[in-house]
Amino acid sequence: MTYQAPDENGFYGKFGGRFVPETLMKAVKELDEAYRASKTDPAFQKELNYYLKEYVGRETPLYFAEQLTAHAGGAKIYLKREDLNHTGAHKINNTIGQALLARQMGKQKVVAETGAGQHGVATATVAALFNMECTIFMGEEDVKRQSLNVFRMELLGAKVVSVKAGSRTLKDAVNEALRFWVANVEDTHYIMGSVLGPHPFPEIVRDYQSVIGIEARKQHLEKEGKLPDAIVACVGGGSNAMGLFYPFVDDVSVQMHGVEAAGHGLETEFHAATISKGEIGILHGAMMDVLQDENGQILEAFSISAGLDYPGIGPEHSFFRDLGRAAYHSVTDDEAVEAFQLLCRTEGIIPALESSHAISYAVKLASQMRPEESMVVCLSGRGDKDVNQLKERLEGQTND
């Protein structure tokens, strides 16, 4: 069977859809039409491919992590090096596409939310490239955690708005960015940073991120003469994971593993494991698994990694879980920090804390597999942004 989702109403099974105020319905439909048209427009696709190659630096390598593999003592571990993209993460694959789309719709201003700051930097980058006005909403907590990325965005000409509402993290930044979009919808495009939000956003972001899996599939076939036995990626909203997974969805021999943030542990209140612990609800314009209390109030998500502490998850991930097509696991802060250090020492690669969650699970999984088997892990971003946070954490532990 060939996988086909979403349906014409933007649903992935019971997840997804389009739950937006009337003021946004026109903009969302306009976006949908522009996106469909762009897919069959050779000039648009040519320009997109030009920027991905010449500006972003694609394709990214599929690197055999020989020492990490030896450490795990099982399957071969390949790293899809999204950390080598311009701006240091997978986020720019999507922002380039959406900025071109905004330009096609005649919109000269863009707005975005950001958690770790990576999507904010990638949005500010393309706004500078295409000479667009850019506003970024970021939770006050994240502004503190990621002050370097705030400065980067400002250097690139963006206005960064610190959000003081609620938990002052990603969820609240999305709320404010959506409000801003409602008020400025005529001349502003919302560059959604993950496979979230009302239809067609999850589909658009998935398709722009699919370059990850398309390349990885081809590269692995060239290196090993077969498809990988497993693919692994971290999941917050889930765009790097969906970008890796989607091109493999019909290859049923390939196991797909998403890794959520377990924070201090699933038995505590301090985690961001939405697919393990969430229940169905509506958040930011779509039906999805959401961390909520018995009254349906959205709970605060928690993770050492600012890019994973979102209380929802992309609707297509929940659909994959229901179909049994992908399995979802979780990794604690401590395990992620351990994996961060392990990759530094074995391969000389400093990964983002987000990606470290995937590395942690991948090492565990590889050790249970045979040496003739192989896996691809999405190294979604580099860890420069996290070094300071990690330094403080490790120094704190030695002082205790």
Curated annotation (Swiss-Prot):
Disulfide bonds: none
Main function: The beta subunit is responsible for the synthesis of L-tryptophan from indole and L-serine.
Pathway listed: Amino-acid biosynthesis; L-tryptophan biosynthesis; L-tryptophan from chorismate: step 5/5
Subunit structure, interactors included: Tetramer of two alpha and two beta chains.
Species, as recorded: Listeria monocytogenes serotype 4a (strain HCC23)
Residues modified as N6-(pyridoxal phosphate)lysine: K91
Enzyme nomenclature, EC number: 4.2.1.20
Enzymatic class: lyase
Alphabetized UniProt keyword annotations: Amino-acid biosynthesis, Aromatic amino acid biosynthesis, Lyase, Pyridoxal phosphate, Tryptophan biosynthesis
UniProt entry tagged with the keyword Amino-acid biosynthesis: yes
UniProt cross-references to PANTHER family, sorted A to Z: TRYPTOPHAN SYNTHASE, TRYPTOPHAN SYNTHASE-RELATED
Family: Belongs to the TrpB family.
Designated gene of the protein: trpB
A Pfam short name: PALP
Domain of life: Bacteria
Protein's recorded name: Tryptophan synthase beta chain
Cofactor(s) listed: pyridoxal 5'-phosphate
HAMAP family xrefs: Trp_synth_beta
An annotated Gene Ontology molecular function: tryptophan synthase activity
Keyword RNA-binding on entry: no
Gene Ontology CC annotation, any one: cytoplasm
Catalytic activity: (1S,2R)-1-C-(indol-3-yl)glycerol 3-phosphate + L-serine = D-glyceraldehyde 3-phosphate + L-tryptophan + H2O
CDD domains in alphabetical order: Trp-synth_B
